[in-house]
């Protein structure tokens, strides 16, 4: 019987990619980033293994949502205490912690288990254009989420 060859963790080549989120649609960007984190863009993808790459997202404060979502999309968190629910809109969270918006969108698209938590640690999000990962020599990954756009 011939078995399917599974890649060994030490033979997998994990690259670093940098993605510019400026003027990109939030959900479409998060979907593409989640695919790269999961490793679905590789031939050796295996569902139960970490075959993905590291992703650095810069310009998180410039990500956009369409329609009335800037005022209507709500982000909720709870302190665990009675009456401890905090609610803020997309605009409020973007002013306060712009990195959190992309992190929450991508985290929701990863598996809800130990593998998903490990994959999430490979996502690095920064508000400006600078990031401290130059030593890893990240490649530029172009993701175009603008319909009909030329980016």
From Swiss-Prot:
Any single GO BP term: negative regulation of translation
Annotated GO molecular function terms are: mRNA binding; structural constituent of ribosome
Q: Which UniProt keywords apply?
A: Ribonucleoprotein, Ribosomal protein
Whether Oxidoreductase counts among this entry's keywords is: no
The record ties this protein, via SUPFAM superfamilies, to:
Ribosomal protein L13
A Gene Ontology term for the protein's cellular component: cytosolic large ribosomal subunit
Which Pfam families does this entry report, sorted A to Z? Ribosomal_L13 (PF00572)
- What interactions and quaternary structure are annotated? Part of the 50S ribosomal subunit.
Functionally, this protein is described as follows: This protein is one of the early assembly proteins of the 50S ribosomal subunit, although it is not seen to bind rRNA by itself. It is important during the early stages of 50S assembly.
Q: Which family does it belong to?
A: Belongs to the universal ribosomal protein uL13 family.
The record's listing under HAMAP family reads: Ribosomal_uL13
Name of the protein:
Large ribosomal subunit protein uL13
Could you read off the lineage of the organism from its UniProt record? Bacteria, Bacillati, Cyanobacteriota, Cyanophyceae, Oscillatoriophycideae
Which gene produces this protein? rplM
């Amino acid at each position: 019987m011939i078995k399917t060859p599974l890649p060994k963790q030490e033979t997998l080549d994990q690259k670093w990619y940098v993605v510019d989120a400026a003027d990109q649609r939030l959900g479409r960007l998060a979907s593409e980033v989640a695919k790269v984190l999961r490793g679905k863009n590789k031939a050796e993808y295996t569902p139960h293994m970490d075959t993905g790459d590291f992703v650095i997202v810069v310009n998180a404060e410039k990500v956009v949502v369409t329609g009335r979502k800037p005022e209507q999309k709500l982000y909720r968190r709870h302190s665990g205490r009675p009456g401890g629910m905090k609610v803020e809109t997309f605009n409020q969270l973007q002013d306060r912690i712009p990195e959190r918006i992309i992190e929450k969108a991508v985290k929701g698209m990863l598996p809800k288990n130990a593998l998903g938590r490990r994959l999430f640690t490979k996502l690095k999000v920064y508000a400006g254009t600078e990031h401290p990962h130059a030593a890893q020599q990240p490649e530029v990954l172009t993701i175009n989420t603008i319909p009909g756009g030329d980016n």
